[in-house]
């Protein structure tokens, strides 16, 4: 049996969980979300707990068992606490500005770059306009959005200019040594 999948997930206070066929719906103080589950795995809600069980002992079902339990746990944690990811912008003149559901970047191109935030994701920029914080209740959507923002101008290895995750370290390279 899956060591992760066999553990029940406790439902926190002020959170509603419902299972409608193969769709799990979670509502909490920070928001609501839903996600589909595979037919090889069943999800039941009883006595303040969510339990995940698999239909058979196939290799795929065993893998989906632990995955589904972790997705349920992440959804419950997301609607209670929420998730956030920090990004840093390095480079002369590089900055970001949030305008409604858009983030306007100045990244050294001949034009400003406009990034549209998906529904359920919010962004905030510090006073220096170099630190960007992205928040969401959906951990998966947050990671995808942060990766897309980073891909606008990934950090380069010589000077480190670009957009990087706050906890990321860039392996720096030494430049060419000029022969005189």
From Swiss-Prot:
Keywords: Ribonucleoprotein, Ribosomal protein, RNA-binding, rRNA-binding. SUPFAM superfamilies: Ribosomal protein L6. GO terms for molecular function: rRNA binding; structural constituent of ribosome. GO terms for biological process: cytoplasmic translation. It holds the Pfam family Ribosomal_L6. InterPro entries: Ribosomal_uL6-like, Ribosomal_uL6-like_a/b-dom_sf, Ribosomal_uL6_a/b-dom, Ribosomal_uL6_bac-type, Ribosomal_uL6_CS. It comes from the Bacteria. GO terms for cellular component: cytosolic large ribosomal subunit. The keyword Nucleotide-binding does not apply. Belongs to the universal ribosomal protein uL6 family. This protein binds to the 23S rRNA, and is important in its secondary structure. It is located near the subunit interface in the base of the L7/L12 stalk, and near the tRNA binding site of the peptidyltransferase center. Part of the 50S ribosomal subunit. This is Large ribosomal subunit protein uL6. It comes from Anaeromyxobacter sp. (strain K).
